[in-house]
Curated annotation (Swiss-Prot):
Name of the protein in question: Fusicoccin H C-9 hydroxylase
EC nos: 1.-.-.-
Family to which this protein belongs: Belongs to the cytochrome P450 family.
Membrane topology: Single-pass membrane protein
Binding of heme, residues: 456
Its job: Cytochrome P450 monooxygenase; part of the 2 gene clusters that mediate the biosynthesis of fusicoccins, diterpene glucosides that display phytohormone-like activity and function as potent activators of plasma membrane H(+)-ATPases in plants by modifying 14-3-3 proteins and cause the plant disease constriction canker.
Pathway: Mycotoxin biosynthesis
Keyword Cell wall biogenesis/degradation: no
Compartment(s) where it occurs, according to its Swiss-Prot or TrEMBL record: Membrane
GO CC entries: membrane
Source species of the chain: Phomopsis amygdali
Gene Ontology biological process terms from the UniProt entry: secondary metabolic process
Transmembrane segments: 12-29
Length: 518
């Protein structure tokens, strides 16, 4: 029998042929997957196919969403070309398909929206990796409980923050609505993450503001480069260097604070062990993070920015809009004061008293309905084919958002542009008695806080802060919009509001309140 041998050249040719065959198979496979995806997407109408829409416009423009559905020929899903690629806009009719987040990745969507692989964007990576659920647990189960048990401290910090920005002048004077609300919200929320000294440190608060601003403005300029080059380009790009410097400024404040708190926690635990006492519970932000991290190393400055960016923006945006809505409806201000005077007449902050501020709760829900934080929600990337109704499929690899246009649908909310807090009571009692009407509740008809697994975990904390802040404003200040702004529904970053300290605060002296949990 003949003996066959393989020369070195033949072995190399065989290896090269195998590699080429594998690469060809991968290319063909990817090509087929791409064509299959395009075929599935072709079932949905494309909005203005020759136009590339800024992704920020899609996220915020109710008019764009309305036009998209109007041009979609009755389809409940349509496509739009944006600066981050093609995005599917899905009707809230299908929201239940995404309740549990199966097959959806919010982190993958963020990767297309921001250059989070670049140095300086670590807080966004921190919020989207395995820490995502840990952060949600901390906010929902630890932070919410902490603020519930420390209402007096919350009231004191709100009082200080409000007086520092709106002053005690009894003469009418103009203040920047957005800037003052941002500062008040930042100081108050940071009190529960840090301490009184740091939350009142203007340099520290400004370092957080600077990072947040740069991340969403200058930092976006990196998106002009291919994503694979972001880590390299960031080493030389001025915007990325500015962002990294802003993060370092936050670290200068946070690192010493964390070292101090860890030392204090260790000291208390050591003393308890020495005396045979039970280990004291460290109910504070540093301890929560260390507990979640276990033996894993993490950057506390990155963690702080990750927690802060979202809370500043959402709560500030909401409070600005709420005050504008109330200023346009001054009769409701007096009704709110009457309700608070009755509910809080025993001069205590309690869980039950917050729950009984029903008119305030409905005003907040209505203001959020009129101007939610965005026009779309549940921004995600499909990790697999997601089947919805009537054979509709969200193809794997597709970017998609769920529209919030039901919040302005006249079939659900008659006269949808009207500020009518009573509609939520009627909606719950008449049309859908099983629908929750509370400000923090979520539903397909009201996705101001998101929906399902994507619901904002900080909404209970934010609602508590907002209710107490509004109560302080109602009894301590008069406020109104300047002439010419009364018919402008949505506030702008440049909007000013006229305020003056009340000479008589009425029956409630909020600064003398007690706190009893019942």
């Amino acid at each position: 029998m003949a003996k066959f041998t393989v020369t070195s050249l033949e072995r190399h040719l065989l290896l090269i042929s195998t590699v080429i065959a594998v690469l060809a198979a991968l290319i063909v496979s990817r090509g087929c997957n791409y064509l299959l995806k395009r075929w599935k997407l072709s079932a949905y109408p494309l909005y203005e196919d020759k136009k590339v829409t800024p992704i920020e416009e899609l996220h915020s423009s109710r008019d764009l969403i309305a036009k998209g559905f109007a041009k979609s020929q009755g389809k409940e899903i349509w496509r739009i070309n944006t600066t981050i690629g093609e995005v599917l806009v899905v009707s809230p009719k299908y929201i239940e398909k995404f309740r549990y987040g199966h097959g959806c990745s919010a982190a993958a969507y963020t990767e297309r929206e921001l250059p989070i692989s670049a140095p300086g964007y670590e807080p966004f990576t921190f919020a989207s990796n395995e820490w995502r659920q840990r952060n949600a647990d901390i906010i929902l189960h630890r932070l919410t409980g902490l603020v519930s048990n420390r209402k007096i401290e919350l009231s004191e910090e709100l009082s200080n923050a409000l007086e520092s920005r709106w002053t005690n002048s009894t003469d009418w004077h103009a203040v920047s609505l957005f800037q003052t609300m941002t500062a008040i919200v930042a100081q108050t929320t940071q009190y529960f993450f840090t301490n009184r000294e740091l939350c009142r440190n203007d340099a520290y608060i400004q370092s957080l503001f600077a990072y947040s601003s740069l991340a969403f403005t200058e930092g976006r300029s990196l998106m002009k480069w291919p994503r694979v080059l972001h880590p390299l380009v960031a080493r030389f790009h001025p915007a990325s260097q500015n962002l990294q410097s802003a993060l370092e400024n936050v670290n200068k404040h946070i690192f010493p604070f964390v070292r101090e708190r860890r030392a204090e926690i260790s000291r208390r635990r050591f003393e308890a062990a020495q005396s045979g006492k039970e280990t004291p519970l460290a109910d504070e932000w540093v301890a929560w993070l260390d507990e979640k991290a276990g033996n894993e190393d993490y950057n506390p400055g990155v963690a702080m920015v990750s927690f802060s960016v979202a809370s500043f923006h959402t709560t500030t945006d909401f409070m600005c809009q709420l005050l504008c809505d109330l200023a346009r409806n001054p009769a409701i201000i007096e009704q709110l004061k009457e309700e608070a005077s009755d509910v809080l007449r025993d001069h205590t902050w309690t869980k039950s008293s917050f729950a009984r501020l029903d008119l305030m709760d409905r005003c907040m829900k209505e203001s959020q309905r009129l101007k939610p934080i965005g026009a779309v929600f549940l921004k995600s990337r499909a990790q697999k084919d997601i089947s919805v109704e009537n054979g509709n499929i969200i193809p794997a690899g597709s970017l998609f958002v769920v529209s919030g246009h039901w919040m302005h649908d006249p079939a659900i909310y008659p006269e949808p542009e009207k500020f009518d807090p009573g509609r939520h009571l009627r909606h719950a009692e008449e049309s859908k008695p099983n629908k929750p009407k509370q400000f923090t509740a979520v539903s397909p008809e009201h996705m101001g806080w998101g929906y399902g697994k994507h619901s904002c975990p900080g909404r209970f904390f934010a609602a508590t802060v907002a209710k107490m802040l509004l109560t302080h404003i109602l009894f301590k200040y008069e406020f109104k919009l300047p002439d010419g702004k009364l018919n402008q529904h949505a506030y702008e970053f440049t909007t000013e509001i006229l305020v003056r300290r009340r000479i008589e605060e009425g029956a409630l002296n909020l600064d003398s309140f007690d706190s009893i949990d019942r």
